[in-house]
Amino acid sequence: MLDDTIAAISTPIGEGGIGIVRISGPDAVKVAKKFFLTKRKDWDQAGSHRLIYGHVFDREGNIVDEVLLSFMRAPRTYTREDVVEINCHGGIVPLRKVLELALANGARLAEPGEFSKRAFLNGRLDLAQAESVIDIIRSKTEAGLRVAVSQLRGDLSRKVEDLQGRLLGLLAQVEANIDFPEDDLEEATVEDILRSGEDLIEEIKEIVRRAEAGKIYREGISTVIIGRPNVGKSSLLNALLRENRAIVTDIPGTTRDIIEEYINIRGIPLKIIDTAGLRETGDAVERIGVEKAREAVEQADLVLLVLDAARGLTEEDYAIIEKVGGKKVIFIVNKADVREKKISSEGAARIAGGRPVLWISALEGTGLDKLEEKIVEMVMGGQVYPKDELIISNTRHRMAMERAADHLAEAVSGIRQNVPVDVVAIDLRAAWESLGEITGTTVTEDLIDRIFADFCIGK
């Protein structure tokens, strides 16, 4: 429904300097006027995009809050509808009270993502741009933010439009033969179509190849630190974070629960997980932590396996190495600053079995730069894409690109095998429609609802 007026709190719930209640729809001004008072009663006639000082009153005439009201006339708004944003003090009570007044005076509580959905349905944003809004909100590094802003700016949409335009050119050439079957396609024309089709396939596949990097920028890499108790796992976490987040003691088994933190490693977000030491234990609480650690290893994209240069290798170390299986693993020999090392370089290389081994001192911070380099190399082959490179970060977009490439490949193969041109045209249309799913020109209403349901209320 686009003919009603919606309202929601648009800022995170909690205590803060400012909180915003957003109202959008044909009656946004009418709703706000019922509980917002300022010296000028016809404030909505003073022009759009203005900030107005006043007070919010409840039905009994009591002041709820001292506020600044932003008034924006359609169509120059986020939703392309009339929008009123009430900037309150950022406490839970005043925000909820203002929202209650908006709902009591004719607005409906917005569904998750409904403001962005209206922006899409009203032509303010295409679907790819609308999805980038949530990516901007959730971005964890500058690289992730850069990818999301590029998408909001329309870089992906323009690329899709370009690919679709060239596909339509191919389709026009093929369909001309359907309309005039007596005019066989000349050999030169066939070669042009094949060459153009293959160029399009390679271009789309290159975008798909970069999508894995985009997914990493968007979602991060789940990285788990494991090892037996007291080898320096928590010290490593603190060293990477550059702060004391985890408890560090000489008592084995100090970490009994999972500690999760996001860190930025050269533009790559790592969800880094410090686990309980993996060992057999009679302590019921510690045993729960050990089981959680095992689950974290199973779900991890990257494992940092910590060994202790001061104490050497034990049966527990070998048992842990077996548990990581075929995971991406970096072996880290900690406490490399001790004089008498009980692990040799040859011994560490032997148990790593060809996997990377790094020597560090989490206490002194030595070796961390090389560790960061190795993480980037393991995760992205050492490649951090240039700022002007188009990268897609959304799995839905990648799958649509893959379908488009597959349909195009079918069309090219069909031309080579002299398949009837109407069948080739079907594949070309399917490729065009697959690309249209990215920007929303060829999606179903059900899919649109599912996409925006993932947004937060107020956005």
From Swiss-Prot:
Please give the GO cellular component terms listed in this UniProt entry.
cytosol
Protein name, entry field = tRNA modification GTPase MnmE
Root EC class: hydrolase
Query: Where, in this chain's numbering, is K(+) bound?
Result: N230, T249, I251, T254
| UniProt cross-references to Pfam families, sorted A to Z | MMR_HSR1, MnmE_helical, TrmE_N
According to its UniProt entry, this protein's organism is: Pelotomaculum thermopropionicum (strain DSM 13744 / JCM 10971 / SI)
Query: Which family is this protein grouped under?
Result: Belongs to the TRAFAC class TrmE-Era-EngA-EngB-Septin-like GTPase superfamily. TrmE GTPase family.
Gene3D superfamilies assigned to the protein according to its UniProt record, in alphabetical order: P-loop containing nucleotide triphosphate hydrolases, Probable tRNA modification gtpase trme, domain 1, tRNA modification GTPase MnmE domain 2
Keywords on this record?
Cytoplasm, GTP-binding, Hydrolase, Magnesium, Metal-binding, Nucleotide-binding, Potassium, tRNA processing
Q: Where does GTP bind?
A: 230-235, 249-255, 274-277, 334-337
Q: Which SMART domains match?
A: AAA
Name one process (GO BP) from the record: tRNA methylation
Subcellular location field: Cytoplasm
Q: Which domain of life is it from?
A: Bacteria
Q: What does this protein do?
A: Exhibits a very high intrinsic GTPase hydrolysis rate. Involved in the addition of a carboxymethylaminomethyl (cmnm) group at the wobble position (U34) of certain tRNAs, forming tRNA-cmnm(5)s(2)U34.
Annotated ranges, domain TrmE-type G: 220-380
Q: How is the cofactor bound?
A: Binds 1 potassium ion per subunit.
Q: Where does (6S)-5-formyl-5,6,7,8-tetrahydrofolate bind?
A: R22, E85, R124, K459
The residues that the entry says bind Mg(2+) are: S234, T255
Q: Which InterPro entries match?
A: AAA+_ATPase, G_TrmE, GTP-bd, GTP-bd_TrmE_N, GTPase_MnmE, MnmE_dom2, MnmE_helical, P-loop_NTPase
Q: Which cofactor does it need?
A: K(+)
Q: Which gene encodes it?
A: mnmE
Task: Describe its assembly.
Answer: Homodimer. Heterotetramer of two MnmE and two MnmG subunits.
Q: Which GO terms describe its molecular function?
A: ATP hydrolysis activity; GTP binding; GTPase activity; metal ion binding
- Which EC numbers characterise this protein's activity in its record? 3.6.-.-
